[in-house]
Regions:
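Short beta-strand-to-turn element immediately C-terminal to the catalytic PLP-Schiff-base lysine
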Residues: 10, 131-133, 195-196
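Conserved anion/nucleotide-ligand pocket segment
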Residues: 153-154, 158-198
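Solvent-exposed alpha-helices and their adjacent loops that cap or buttress functional pockets
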Residues: 1-2, 32-33, 81-83, 114-116, ...
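Short, glycine/charged-enriched secondary-structure capping and boundary segments
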Residues: 22-24, 54-57, 103-107, 137-140, ...
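N-terminal beta1-alpha1 cap of cysteine-dependent amidohydrolase-like domains
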Residues: 1-92
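Short glycine-rich anion-binding loops that position phosphate/pyrophosphate groups of nucleotides
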Residues: 13, 93-97, 128
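Class I SAM-dependent methyltransferase SAM-binding "motif I" and its flanking Rossmann-like core
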Residues: 98-169
Length: 198
């Protein structure tokens, strides 16, 4: 792997819905250039849903990698050590706002930026896709879609589930018209966008 960070933003779906559909996951692992890369999963946004974690292992134990996951709501291990050992950091979907609040409390945001600058592969689906951008379109609020500030590793805005949820497209267009979000990326479910640092 070249000494440049990678971010793979997945618009929806993935192993959370179908652990047997693994094309994007294989692509992510191949980016490391390693025979058996270490991949760590952060299911924070889903409140660490057990079924989601099971699907993660169903998917990645069938691929040539060493999968693990981290919980932040139980006894939390040393995050710096885990991030240092990881080749791939995979972030699951769920509530983006709550996830980022927890991450910042644990200073995980700073560790992830360091990992990106060291050339590791950062990736994720839905909340795990938009978290890397300056802005993300999220349904973290039950009432309606909102634009929120995210980590800012990548410029502009990102919206997942663009064709999967009927309100996404018109709501995003309305937000753009009203200046509630900037230009950016609308990512369909089952699709991914690859950003290469440098």
């Amino acid at each position: 792997m070249e000494d440049k960070g990678h971010i793979i933003a997945i618009g929806g779906g993935g192993f959370g819905r179908n652990p047997n559909h693994r094309k994007i996951e294989k692509y992510i692992l191949d980016l490391t250039g390693k025979e058996k890369p270490n991949i760590v999963f952060f299911p924070t946004a889903s409140a660490e849903d057990k079924g989601y974690i099971v699907n993660y292992y169903k998917c990645f134990t069938k691929l040539n990698c060493d999968p693990s996951h981290v919980t932040l709501f139980q006894r939390t291990p040393r995050l710096d050590s885990i991030i240092n050992k990881a080749d791939v950091i995979y972030v699951g979907g769920g509530n983006t706002k709550s996830m980022l609040a927890v991450w910042r409390e644990w200073k995980l945001d700073k560790l992830l930026l360091k990992a990106y600058n060291q050339g590791k592969v950062l990736c994720g689906v839905s909340a795990g896709a938009i978290c890397w951008f300056e802005q993300g379109i999220t349904d973290s609020w039950a009432s309606n879609l909102n634009s929120m500030e995210c980590l800012g590793f990548l410029p502009e805005m990102a919206c997942p589930h663009y064709q999967e949820e009927k309100d996404r497209r018109p709501d995003v267009h309305e937000m753009l018209k009203k200046g509630k979000c900037g230009p950016g990326w609308a990512i369909d479910g089952g699709a991914a966008v690859h950003f290469n640092k440098g």
